[in-house]
Amino acid sequence: MTKSELIERIAERQDQLSAKDIELAVKLILEYMSQCLANGDRIEIRGFGSFSLHYRAPRTGRNPKTGESVELEGKFVPHFKPGKEMRDRVNESLEELP
C-alpha cells in the first residue's frame, strides 16, 4: 500500500474530514516520525509496534554490475518491531487464507 492509497482508504471510511485534511495529517505524522528517528529517538505505538535505529557495522559489499568488492561504511538504519497485538492480528488474518 502506498501513502496515496492509505489516504484514499482513510477518506473512504469516514466523512468528517476532507481528503486534503487527511493527506495533511498523514504527511505530518510521517514527517514527525522521520524527524524523531533522525534525532535518535525511539517511537512506540502501543498495540502497533515500535520504530528505532539499529547500527549496521562496516562491511565488505559487492558491486552487482561489476562484481568487484566495495567497502561499506557503518550506518544507522530504521528498524520496525511489531507489537504483540499486530503480530496476532496478522497471523489470524493469514490463517484464514487458503
From Swiss-Prot:
The transmembrane residues are none
Q: Which gene encodes it?
A: ihfB
Q: How does it assemble?
A: Heterodimer of an alpha and a beta chain.
- A single Pfam family it belongs to is Bac_DNA_binding
Record GO biological process: DNA recombination; regulation of DNA-templated transcription; regulation of translation
Function text: This protein is one of the two subunits of integration host factor, a specific DNA-binding protein that functions in genetic recombination as well as in transcriptional and translational control.
Q: Show the NCBIfam families listed in the entry.
A: hip, PRK00199.1
Q: Which GO terms describe its cellular component?
A: chromosome; cytosol
Q: Which organism is it from?
A: Teredinibacter turnerae (strain ATCC 39867 / T7901)
* The name this protein goes by in its record: Integration host factor subunit beta
Family from the record: Belongs to the bacterial histone-like protein family.
Tell me which UniProt keywords the record has, alphabetically.
DNA recombination, DNA-binding, Transcription, Transcription regulation, Translation regulation
GO molecular function per UniProt: DNA binding; structural constituent of chromatin
Q: Does the keyword Repeat apply?
A: no
- Signal peptide (from-to): none
